[in-house]
Amino acid sequence: MDSKLRHRIEDFYYLEAELLDERKLREWLALLTDDVRYWMPIRHNPLERPNDITDELSKPGEGYYFDDNMKSLKIRVERTYAKNAWAEVPPSRTRHLITNIRIKKDDGNEIAVHSNFLVYRTRMETDKDMFVGTRQDLLRRSNGSFKLAWRTIILDQAVLDAKNISVFF
């Protein structure tokens, strides 16, 4: 794959992480397409050895942590700014670490990209959470940059210890 393209995609992801960590969520929304799908399936531990990682994940319609489109993402973002949003008062402090960025397919208009993440969140005095996993994205070229058209977030954890999932990945 083209190293310049990979570098541009890395810069896009680093900008996204910066916006999320600085709580610039409205600006983050501008990085998404109007028809975005942003979802996190539930991971389970099958009794038999799975043939593929997808065998460990819920399928669409079977349950999920969230399955958002632009409308629901806007609602989630605006809720974080509300004074009565108990899940984010006081706001979370996050650090998004994005690694192992791999271009899987480039059809000229859309690019399939996989990346690994570690999202560290702290709240209050002692609340700490770590979310670790992989993201399967579809980026769409837009005005010399990219927009996120689809993101599947796959957590390594089958059981979440976090009190909520109010952060974005």
Predicted segments with their positions:
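A solvent-exposed, acidic/Ser-Thr-rich amphipathic alpha-helical stretch
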Residues: 34-114
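Beta-strand elements of well-folded, non-transmembrane domains
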Residues: 117-123, 141
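Hydrophobic pocket/interface hotspot
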Residues: 16, 28, 73, 113, ...
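A contiguous catalytic/ligand-binding core that recognizes phosphate-bearing ligands
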Residues: 94-97, 104-107, 120, 130-131, ...
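A short, polar/proline- and glycine-enriched secondary-structure boundary/capping micro-motif
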Residues: 49-50, 123-127, 157-165
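Short beta-strand edge/turn micro-motifs at domain boundaries
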Residues: 108-114, 132-164
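Short, low-complexity N-terminal intrinsically disordered segments enriched in polar/charged residues
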Residues: 1-34, 46
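Short beta-strand segments enriched in hydrophobic/aromatic residues
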Residues: 32, 117-119, 152
